[in-house]
């Protein structure tokens, strides 16, 4: 570690603040317009400037309503002072022994296999069953029949378990050392999530409500495409994580190459806290380099842990080298350890463990564990790491908003105290045997069976008839659930993302990020349409925000949209199995979009006179290109800059509604318009003839007038494609990607196989699965995820525009 790096590390530590949810997690829309219908959150990096008095004053001067009577140079707003609840000693003790953890990774990294071992070692299940149902049982967390058939996780599954582990490092008293204290029982809520990109919403909503996560990686494949996506989701919600390098028994496993990928590809400050004893088929255990102890799994299915100070000579040098590397990496993330390191003072195992906990919970470091879930090795030390290094609910600050205050008002910290007013978030819905099953994270207060709770979105008061804790598809009835817990309710009608309170507060929390669908296809029942067809589509839409249904206005076909072919195939199959409705589907369609590349002004008057009261509305302004907000996914906006009363306030929502209607159907190919901001600068109204309809039509006409002047283009979804195949087929694979007009981003060769990363238009990827199987003799595999929308080639846009024009003329 250079002197400059050491100094920089110390400066960074002096400026580091404790772990706090970022603006997105605090659900804190900080910029809103009094005339707009929705808040437009700014990026978290702008939080400091937004909360300054100068910003608030300039904000008020610029955005005050035309009808407001605010004086010149608005005064600084004063917000209500609140007395926050306090944690009792009972709460503190309970929360210190509570963990809410998700297990996420790329597909086939071993998440569900790992969760199965966790459940077995914690005593939640009596025997271990494998993922693909080879023993006709299947893994506990893959409870859906389709999951066991296909060997993949489709829905996230929740469970809970108790684990006895040593006291966390930061709770150690004087004279106590890490790992040598009395063991205590920890309650762990676990959510196992899908690894396939098509089911990314399951990962999204799980991470929204969790306090920590385990990122599982394959010791051979390392960081893969969905690993990058999961890492991005964890960063979006500021979720501290541990990394677990699985499949250490596989040929070609190299954990330190994977750690290098974590640092290089994910820009993660990560280091191993273990080194393997043996490699590949000889993998026998791990060395805990924090305490310098060898750990082996013995007994029936590895249920006995044997620790010894006798580290095999073959790995002693490696263990000492990686321990020094761990201390150096960790000293850049923890000020206390950095001081010891720079002063060349003795560093004890307790010093390292305490620094690991501080740096992990504050998102500055990721400890890396190793093992093989399928070989029952290394799972128990990982559980100890979850209890030692991941935060408890009281160490993560969650925020709520007051629905009675403007959206830019300060957020309210939620305190996980049992006697505080109830605040909970419904993050997932399922259709259970006894009605709707609503998964809930309780952030504050206590939720009791039979109690009355309020839906902050609808204002409705509902009763909780049944309260359960989930164990995959099994349920355990409970009378009450306290702050920090995850549970499920029966018989409560709501939507995903709804906030519930006990009625004593007006708090609300915002929901999770929902990506837009990228693929669509038409669907109809094989025979006569039955009520079950509509019932199934309605249910699937309610459960999955990324599954959309609409009826095409021209063909009158029912169109379903989702995140990929597999996503839609699963729902078609579920419709057949669960509702006995066999369906016929059309050819998949790509979700094309239209956008503008330049700003364009408009000055449009809508006038209609037919005797008596007519219609009059004039709007002046511009449309501008707009980047997608990476935190909220919002890519369209309406901005009112009118100062004065040229357009009465009651007509502004009608103008915004007209803008939203105009976005539904583009002028080049008829596809929805995205990436566009509507700026209203001025206009005029008529005392008699102006009404909402007139201004709505004026907005539509103005948008269409300006759209053609703003150099519009057609966009298509582009996918990041990752292909893994034997090295002898590399030439064929590259040739096929070039044939599909793909752009090769990266190629990595290891041993006898290679990994190719490319960006290819989704429209050019249809049929690739069969082609890859044929050219690699069935040995190649690929995965793809949505990257962004990019302009189509000019000749393609011309063809699409001509086809759309002919279609319109033929009507």
UniProtKB/Swiss-Prot annotation:
On whether Signal is a keyword of this UniProt record, the answer is: no
According to the UniProt record, one GO cellular component term is: mitochondrion
Q: Give the matching Gene3D superfamilies.
A: 3.30.230.10, 3.30.70.240, Elongation Factor G (Translational Gtpase), domain 3 (3.30.70.870), P-loop containing nucleotide triphosphate hydrolases (3.40.50.300), Translation factors (2.40.30.10)
Q: Which residues take part in binding GTP?
A: 105-112, 192-196, 246-249
Spell out the subcellular localization from the entry.
Mitochondrion
Per the record, the coiled-coil ranges are none
MF terms in GO: GTP binding; GTPase activity; translation elongation factor activity
Name any one Pfam family assigned in the record.
Answer: EFG_IV
Tell me which CDD domains the record gives: EF-G, EFG_III, EFG_mtEFG1_IV, mtEFG1_C, mtEFG1_II_like
Q: Tell me which residues make up the tr-type G domain.
A: 96-394
Query: Which keywords does UniProt give here?
Result: Elongation factor, GTP-binding, Mitochondrion, Nucleotide-binding, Protein biosynthesis, Transit peptide
Question: One biological-process term from Gene Ontology?
Answer: mitochondrial translational elongation
Q: Where is the transit peptide?
A: 1-64
The annotated pathway is: Protein biosynthesis; polypeptide chain elongation
Instruction: Give the UniProt family note.
Output: Belongs to the TRAFAC class translation factor GTPase superfamily. Classic translation factor GTPase family. EF-G/EF-2 subfamily.
What is the protein's known function?
A: Mitochondrial GTPase that catalyzes the GTP-dependent ribosomal translocation step during translation elongation. During this step, the ribosome changes from the pre-translocational (PRE) to the post-translocational (POST) state as the newly formed A-site-bound peptidyl-tRNA and P-site-bound deacylated tRNA move to the P and E sites, respectively. Catalyzes the coordinated movement of the two tRNA molecules, the mRNA and conformational changes in the ribosome.
According to UniProt, the name of this protein is: Elongation factor G, mitochondrial
The organism encoding this protein is Cryptococcus neoformans var. neoformans serotype D (strain JEC21 / ATCC MYA-565)
């Amino acid at each position: 570690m250079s002197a400059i790096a050491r100094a920089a590390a110390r400066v960074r530590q002096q400026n580091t603040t404790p772990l706090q949810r970022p603006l997105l997690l605090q659900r804190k829309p900080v910029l809103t317009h009094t005339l707009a219908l929705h808040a437009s959150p700014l990026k978290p990096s702008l939080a400091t400037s937004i909360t300054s008095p100068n910003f608030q004053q300039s904000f008020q001067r610029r955005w005050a309503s035309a009808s407001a009577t605010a004086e010149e140079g608005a005064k600084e707003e004063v917000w209500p002072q609140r007395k926050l609840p306090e944690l009792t000693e009972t709460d503190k003790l309970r929360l210190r022994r509570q963990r809410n953890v998700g297990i996420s990774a790329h597909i086939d990294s071993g998440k569900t296999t790992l969760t199965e071992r966790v459940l077995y070692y914690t005593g939640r299940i009596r025997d271990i069953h494998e993922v693909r149902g080879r023993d006709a049982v299947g893994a506990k967390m893959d409870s859906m029949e389709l999951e066991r058939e296909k060997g993949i996780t489709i829905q996230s599954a929740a469970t809970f378990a108790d684990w006895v582990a040593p006291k966390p490092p930061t709770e150690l008293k004087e004279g106590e050392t890490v790992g040598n204290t009395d063991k205590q029982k920890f309650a762990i809520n676990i959510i196992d999530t899908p690894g396939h990109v098509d089911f990314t919403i399951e990962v999204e909503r799980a991470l929204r409500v969790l306090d920590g996560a385990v990122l599982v990686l394959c010791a051979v494949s390392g960081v893969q495409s969905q690993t990058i996506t999961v890492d991005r989701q964890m960063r979006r919600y500021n979720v501290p994580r541990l990394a677990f390098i699985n499949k250490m028994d596989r040929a070609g496993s190299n954990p330190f190459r994977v750690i290098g990928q974590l640092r290089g590809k994910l820009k993660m400050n990560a280091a191993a806290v273990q080194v393997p004893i043996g490699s590949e088929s000889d993998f026998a255990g791990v060395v805990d380099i924090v305490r310098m102890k060898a750990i082996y799994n013995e007994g029936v299915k590895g249920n006995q842990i044997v620790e010894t100070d006798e580290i095999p000579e073959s790995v002693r040098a490696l263990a000492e080298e990686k321990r020094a590397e761990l201390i150096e990496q960790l000293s850049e993330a923890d000020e206390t350890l950095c001081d010891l390191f720079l002063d060349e003072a003795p560093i004890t195992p307790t010093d390292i463990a305490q620094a690991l906990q501080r740096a992990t919970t504050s998102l500055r470091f990721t400890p890396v564990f190793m093992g093989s879930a399928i070989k029952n090795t290394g799972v128990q030390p990982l559980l100890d790491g979850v209890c030692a290094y991941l935060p408890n609910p009281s160490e993560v600050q969650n925020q709520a908003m007051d629905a009675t205050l403007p959206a830019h008002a300060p957020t309210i910290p939620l305190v996980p105290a049992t006697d505080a007013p109830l605040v909970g978030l419904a993050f997932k819905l399922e259709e259970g045997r006894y009605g709707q099953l609503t998964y809930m994270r309780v952030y504050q207060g206590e939720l009791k069976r039979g109690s009355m709770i309020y839906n902050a979105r609808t204002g409705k008061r509902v009763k909780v008839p049944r309260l359960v804790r989930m164990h995959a598809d099994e349920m355990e009835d409970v009378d009450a659930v306290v702050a920090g817990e995850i549970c499920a309710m029966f018989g409560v009608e709501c939507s995903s993302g709804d906030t519930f309170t006990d009625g004593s507060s007006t708090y609300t929390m915002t929901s999770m990020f929902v990506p837009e669908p990228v693929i669509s296809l038409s669907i109809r029942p094989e025979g006569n349409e039955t009520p079950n067809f509509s019932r199934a589509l309605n249910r699937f839409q309610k459960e999955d925000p990324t599954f959309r249904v609409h009826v095409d206005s021209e063909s009158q076909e029912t169109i379903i949209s989702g995140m990929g072919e597999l996503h839609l195939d699963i729902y078609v199959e579920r419709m057949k199995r669960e509702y006995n409705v066999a369906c016929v589907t059309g050819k998949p369609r790509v979700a094309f979009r239209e956008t503008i590349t330049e700003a364009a002004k408009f000055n449009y008057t809508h006038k209609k006179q037919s005797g008596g009261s007519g219609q009059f509305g004039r709007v002046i302004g511009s449309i501008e290109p707009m980047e997608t907000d990476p935190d909220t996914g919002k890519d369209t906006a309406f901005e009112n800059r009118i100062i004065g009363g040229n357009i009465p306030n009651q007509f502004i929502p009608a103008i915004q509604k007209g803008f939203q209607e105009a976005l539904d159907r583009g002028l080049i190919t008829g596809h929805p318009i995205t990436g566009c901001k509507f700026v209203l600068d001025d206009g005029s109204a008529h005392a008699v003839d102006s009404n909402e309809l007139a201004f709505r039509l004026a907005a539509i006409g103005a948008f269409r007038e300006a759209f053609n002047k703003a150099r519009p283009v057609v966009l298509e979804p582009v996918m990041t494609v990752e292909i893994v195949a034997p090295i002898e087929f590399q030439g064929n694979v590259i040739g096929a990607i070039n044939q599909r007009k793909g752009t090769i981003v990266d190629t990595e060769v290891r041993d006898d196989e290679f990994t190719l990363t490319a960006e290819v238009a989704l429209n050019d990827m249809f049929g690739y699965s069969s082609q890859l199987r044929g050219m690699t003799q069935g040995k190649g595999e690929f995965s793809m995820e949505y990257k962004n929308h990019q302009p189509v080639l000019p000749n393609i846009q011309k063809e699409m525009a001509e086809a759309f024009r002919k279609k319109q003329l033929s009507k």
